[in-house]
C-alpha cells in the first residue's frame, strides 16, 4: 500500500500470513511515481537479480541489497551483497562494513523488541542517550 494503492487490498491477507510474499518484491516495482533512483533491500537472495534486472530495464539508478545472513538491509554483522544498477546494467559487489572501520556486531545485538521497547529505544536515541543501540 505504500507504493501502489491497488496493493492495499492484499495487505490484510499478507499481514495474516506473517511471512514474506511476492508482494514484498512487487511493491517497490509497482511504485506509480516511477522513481529514477531507488535503494531497496530484499531478504531472499533469488530476488536480487530479478529486481536489479527490472530496475535496469526501467532506466533506474540505485541499489538492491541484502545482508548475507538473510536480512533485507545492509548488515553490520557480516557482508552484504549489493547489486548496483546504473546505465541500464547492474554489477554485483560485496560490502563489508569492517572495510570502513565499522566494528562488526552480532545480529542479536541489534534486533529490536516489541513496539513498546522499540519506541523506548528510539526516544532514548533522539534524546542523545549514548549506548550500543545509539551507536548503530
Where on the chain are the PLM-derived regions?
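Glycine-rich anion-binding loops and their surrounding alpha/beta cores
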Residues: 1-136
